[in-house]
Swiss-Prot record:
Residues 34-60 form a coiled coil. InterPro entries: Slain. Pfam families: SLAIN. This is SLAIN motif-containing protein-like. Residues 405-415 have a biased composition (Low complexity). It comes from Xenopus tropicalis (Western clawed frog). Residues 404-441, 473-622 are annotated as: Disordered. Keywords: Coiled coil.
Length: 622
């Protein structure tokens, strides 16, 4: 029998007591209908308790561990089943003492063994409840209750065997659950070792980019292996750069082959041939104008033919090119080639111009030396005056020729000279006469003077006025040229060249020959009278459209001016016929050295112009 005060026992669960009492009430025949409701309530309570136990196991898993109680001689270990069984007190009898060491060893094994089996504590608890609650009908369970409502029970041999099996199962399940519950989510977190982090750089110990990892892996390779890998496996940028470089090299080779090909050689050959022909024909006085045109034409045509060839080749290259870089490079090469072609053309024109200028200078020096030998004396000032062009030309052509005479710069090249300037230079060079035929043309000029007298008496007043103004202006210009230079300055007459006959001499608007002769005369008239006679003529204007200078005639002329003209006319009217006769006789007897004396020529030219103006002022008066 079980005595309540002898030994501590395991208290029985209240739920089991209620279920036992309900079973006893059902056995009674005179129970009421309320018992059914009580039974239902008991079932609900059981379910709720099971759910509570499950929640407790999840929250506090260590509370369901089996606690060992010392005292092998008089008690078994108490098994705490988390409220399902408050206490189970098993009093061993004489035959049960042999099983006590086995139970104790199993309890020690439960505390020592640890296995990893997840979430089996609940199943073990359910099985243990089932074993404890569902007692077999063949087993005898004695229930003793004391006054303090403490229930103790005792089981026989068959009940003990079932209890031992349940305890063994519980020990295995609880031991596996302890190891599982020890492992938490924090165990999976890597431990950060600060000692190892201090060895790395301060800015990358927390985060390392994947590129740096790749670079670190590449550093491990040898340089030869790395070069082999880069050369075998090109990046897209490297391939694009290679393609552009290959395209540029191909275009450079094509331009080089084009520059050396026979496509451009005929134009260059023709240019050289025509330029050489032009340089050879520069010595003749009548071919300068045509030569300049030929130079200009051949230079421009050669450049155009070369440029057209370059343009066609550049279009082909632009079609063959595959990238934008090669196209832009093609344009750059085309511009560079054009610059080279222009440079070569300019160099060729420089050579031709230098050759022409040297030829003209040598020709002038030879003629000047011939005249100096004939005269015996020839000063430097006279040579400079002789080498310059006549002052009757325009100012721009004068400055151009003076710079061309003293400097070898190619101002007549097509790039820096307009066709009008070249034509004017050609015209003046063509009509410049040699010095050796002065006497013959003096005699011809006498005939032209007689023709002028006839025209003056036959033409109406308008024509006479134009003739008078033309002669007056020309005489004033000759006086200006004489006053600007010294008295010993050479004055050259303008006359047609040997290749041009007198019938082809150009005439002005009034059918008067444009070429005048300054005839030598007697030095009897003073220079002051000539200057006073030129003063009213200088005040006259001229018309640029017709190329002739005319007097602005008005009804009321200045009396002083007219008086001066009349006085001069009266003073020099007696010398007119004697001058013409003496000049005609001097054409065959006077030597050439006396003909070219500058002082007599200047005075005679001024005298000749003054005699032409003697009676001309009366023609405008009615």
């Amino acid at each position: 029998m079980v005595v309540p005060g002898n030994s501590p026992g395991i208290p029985r669960d209240h739920a089991i007591d209620i279920s036992d009492r309900a079973m006893d009430l059902e056995a009674e025949p005179d129970h009421s209908s309320d018992l059914k409701e009580v039974q239902k309530l008991h079932e609900l309570v059981k379910r709720l308790e099971i759910q509570n136990q499950q929640l407790k196991i999840k929250r506090n898993p260590q509370s369901s561990n089996i606690q060992n109680i010392s005292g092998i001689d008089n008690q078994l270990s108490a098994l705490n089943c988390s409220g399902v069984m408050n206490s189970i007190n098993i009093q061993p009898e004489k035959g049960d003492l042999q099983k006590m060491p086995n139970l104790q060893s199993q309890l020690e094994q439960i505390s020592s063994e640890k296995e990893n089996i997840p979430a089996l504590g609940m199943d073990a608890q359910m099985q243990y409840e089932k074993v404890c609650s569902d007692s077999k009908p063949g087993s005898k369970v004695e229930i003793n209750c004391d006054q303090d409502d403490c229930c103790f029970y005792s089981v026989d041999g068959s009940g003990r065997s079932d209890l031992e099996e349940a305890i063994s199962k519980m020990s295995e399940l609880n031991s596996s659950g302890e190891n599982i519950l020890d492992e938490t989510a924090l165990d999976e977190v890597d431990v950060l070792e600060l000692g190892s982090c201090s060895e790395d750089e301060e800015d990358c110990w927390l985060y390392v980019s994947p590129r740096k990892v790749e670079n670190a892996e590449q550093k491990l390779d040898s340089p030869l292996k790395w070069c082999r890998q880069v050369l075998d496996h090109h990046s897209p940028e490297t391939e694009a750069a290679c393609r552009s470089l290959i395209g540029k090299l191909d275009q450079a080779s094509r331009w080089k082959s084009l520059y050396c090909s026979p496509l451009a050689s005929p134009s260059a050959y023709n240019t050289n041939a025509e330029c050489s022909y032009g340089s050879n024909t520069l010595n003749s006085p009548g071919c300068l104008k045509s030569t300049n045109k030929a130079l200009l034409t051949c230079g421009s045509s050669g450049y155009l033919s070369f440029h057209s060839a370059l343009s066609s080749q550049s279009s082909v290259d632009s079609e063959l090119s595959t990238s934008d870089d090669s196209i832009s490079m093609g344009y750059k090469l085309q511009d560079l080639t054009d610059v080279q072609v222009m440079a070569r053309l300019q160099e060729e024109s420089l050579r031709q111009d230098y050759a022409s200028s040297s030829a003209s200078v040598s020709r002038r020096s030879s003629s000047a030396s011939l005249h100096s030998l004939r005269r015996g004396t020839f000063s430097d000032q006279e040579f400079d005056t002789y080498s310059l062009e006549d002052e009757d030309d325009c100012d721009c052509s004068l400055s151009f020729r003076s710079s061309h005479r003293y400097s070898p710069s190619p101002l007549s090249s097509p790039r820096c000279q307009s066709p009008s300037a070249a034509e004017s230079r050609a015209t003046t060079s063509r009509i410049r006469p040699p010095r050796r035929s002065i006497q013959n043309h003096v005699q011809e000029r006498m005939k032209y003077a007689n023709c002028e007298d006839e025209l003056r008496h036959s033409m109406p007043n308008l024509a006479k006025t134009s003739l008078r103004s033309l002669e007056a202006v020309r005489s004033s210009r000759s006086l200006e040229s004489d006053l600007q230079g010294p008295s010993s300055r050479l004055t050259r007459m303008q006359q047609p060249s040997t290749s041009t006959p007198p019938s082809k001499v150009r005439y002005g608007a009034s059918n008067q020959p444009a070429l005048t002769v300054r005839q030598p005369g007697k030095p009897g008239v003073s220079t002051s009278s000539l200057m006073t006679s030129r003063q009213p003529v200088k005040s006259s204007g001229y018309n640029n459209s017709s190329g002739l200078r005319k007097i602005q005639s008005s009804p009321g002329l200045n009396p002083s001016g007219s008086g001066a003209v009349s006085r001069t006319g009266n003073a020099s009217s007696s010398i007119k016929h004697s001058t013409v006769k003496s000049q005609a006789s001097m054409g065959s007897t006077v030597p050439k050295s006396k003909m070219i004396q500058p002082s007599r020529r200047s005075l005679s030219s001024a005298k000749m112009n003054s005699t032409l103006d003697d009676d001309s002022w009366k023609d405008g008066c009615y």
